[in-house]
């Protein structure tokens, strides 16, 4: 027993009929044109038969095409309705699951809670007052900047061997005079500097 639905079988039959009508119309039209190209008269019985059959086949093909278009249109409408039904069913399930959120008592209670919270926040701000030090405090304000500057001025730099070597290799200031950047000759009586090593 086939597992195809009746709708599938109907679609298959319609497709087969449409293909057959298309092929039949094409064959009769081609036969008609061949007779004309071969010099047949329009009074020729062969031409009359071929031309009449071609007209009937073309009419049948047009009917099949219109029928297929109407069927497709109806099926599309059905799919649209089914999609709408599924959409509304899903929405209904969600609303039923969360029914308490749309109840009038819940909405009134939520509004009252929001109003109470606003009133309590206002009372809290009134209790704090406008002269509290941290009223307008923001992240890294002037006090934070002053504290960081104090730390930078009072904290000694690290004295690790690595940083000491960096101090020997990297100048602390950049010379403004380009002549200062030229290598200076070593005097004959001056010994070269002894490399500094840690013991």
Swiss-Prot record:
One Pfam family matching this protein: Herpes_UL14
Composition bias type Polar residues, residue spans: 176-191
Location(s), subcellular: Virion tegument; Host cytoplasm; Host nucleus
Domain of life according to the entry: Viruses
Protein name (database record): Tegument protein UL14 homolog
Location of region: Disordered: 176-199
Annotated organism of origin: Varicella-zoster virus (strain Oka vaccine)
Keywords: Host cytoplasm, Host nucleus, Virion, Virion tegument
GO CC, alphabetical: host cell cytoplasm; host cell nucleus; viral tegument
PTM note: Phosphorylated.
Keyword Repeat: no
Described purpose of this protein according to its UniProt entry: Contributes to the nuclear transport of the viral transcriptional activator VP16 homolog during the early phase of infection. Therefore, participates indirectly in the regulation of the immediate-early gene expression. Additionally, seems to be important for efficient nuclear targeting of capsids.
InterPro entries associated with the record: Herpes_UL14
Family statement drawn from the similarity comment of this UniProt entry: Belongs to the alphaherpesvirinae HHV-1 UL14 protein family.
Record keyword GTP-binding present: no
